[in-house]
């Protein structure tokens, strides 16, 4: 599913630039994605669109987020720490944080891998038509193992 999401981010400027689900499914199949992976991604994107509509403007900039035990278990410490990092850097406002948490919680399975959370955050920016600044975009795309330490 995450490969499909990255493909959409790289090939469509905004969600409204994407064709309808049927045409998009055909295009994604033609590129080589599996039908189950495509269906999962499109369902997840529908949830993203709904979450974006329901969370915009509902949080104060001064609010403090307390994660429930189920959120802590599902997100994992690395993902929660990364969300906190983005918030403290001033690039992930509370409404976008809530959308990211909502979409991460929509995933099945155990703790969300940090790489997957980064794609989720990237897709939240994408869904709202916002481009993260270059440093944050680098943080979202580059693996820590690939970084060159000076």
Curated annotation (Swiss-Prot):
InterPro entries the UniProt entry points to: Smg
Xref: Pfam families: DUF494
Family indicated by similarity: Belongs to the Smg family.
PANTHER family (alphabetical): PROTEIN SMG
HAMAP family documented for this protein: Smg (MF_00598)
Name recorded for this polypeptide: Protein Smg homolog
Organism in which the protein naturally occurs: Leptothrix cholodnii (strain ATCC 51168 / LMG 8142 / SP-6)
